[in-house]
């Protein structure tokens, strides 16, 4: 069994993953080989919502390796802090952000996020009290924050259990590989298959991605 570590995971002391995989296997026996091949830990929450959304923007449409390097260099700008607050970010010159590898659109997007967090500070502190759909509706009001970015926030920050980002390319590739499809599945095809995985679709977003690393 290959054990894969995602960002923001912890040892599954409470058995969340075990419970989820048992349910998923009962709902979809074809997943047996996947669960025998891959082992993942439980998700752990991220308390800094601003950091989480900025990170997802940096990772948009980039490989994990490339995005990780850019995000590391970005954080080094603010060496005295573990992560800048929205005001610090807005004070940072465009050229400084550009120098670490951020594109101009992404610089504008994270500035939009910073401005929105300043304006809606109290509202955003209570995001976890909202439903998944309410959070998507609220955060996608920010220019540059699309459904995928919010889905990453729901999964890796709030640890919501039933998120399935059908537009994620790595997930689509893993889905194609595991189910031995000739072509990349459409978002509709993935959504139809994923119906049987409710209410644990988040974990079925992680397993296929891990599977691609083994092939």
Regions found by a protein language model. Name each.
Residues 53, 57, 61:
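Short, aromatic/basic-rich helix-turn unit that serves as a nucleic-acid recognition element
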